[in-house]
């Protein structure tokens, strides 16, 4: 009657359900210190528990959640949020309030170094990322994480489309900041009808005009990626 659409909001890699954490602790991401985010509270946030995108079973779990949501009567679409890694670096305007110093990438917040990620990367490049002298300087290791997250996002979004629903995702502010801060290469997320960049400029210590700058960067990145979905 009023043109209102119903879209389900789905937390994607960020899954806090106790039954899931207890049943499959191996699904959760591990930092460069060997600590699982299932066991530690990142940024003192209880909900910061993140599934690893390298594991096929985590993607299948998320696909099943999509199929469940798609059964909701009157549902128009499904919106993927938290389709990323934990913040390796928080947006700059939040450092003081969260009590962190992040002048570089620190092992505590650098994910994922679980057995599956290490195994798959070694198959591709012949080295365990744990053995890299400086993982942050290894372009192949960065690209691996961007790619596996993009594949998970694309595969989950494909199921949304198969269910006949509109697919969308919340993404970080600009493509480069997103890749740097949360390992999210959203310009290469396929099968999405819409992306909604979270251009919270004050989080980045930016003035209002940066909203336009970040928007333009996003449009240009999508064009450069030749992403047919958007």
Segments from the language model and where they lie:
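Active-site beta-loop-alpha junctions enriched in small/polar residues
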Residues: 11-15, 82-85, 172-176, 200-202
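Aromatic- and acidic-residue-enriched segments that line the glycan-binding/catalytic groove
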Residues: 14-44, 83-130, 187
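Generic structural signal for hydrophobic
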Residues: 1, 62, 69-70, 189, ...
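Active-site-adjacent "subsite" loops/lids of carbohydrate-active enzymes
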Residues: 5-73
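Aromatic-lined substrate-binding rim segments of carbohydrate-active enzymes
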Residues: 1-18, 24-29, 140-164
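Glycoside hydrolase catalytic-domain groove-lining segments
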Residues: 108-230
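Conserved, mostly hydrophobic/aromatic
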Residues: 6, 62, 69, 78-81, ...
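A structural motif
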Residues: 74-75, 192
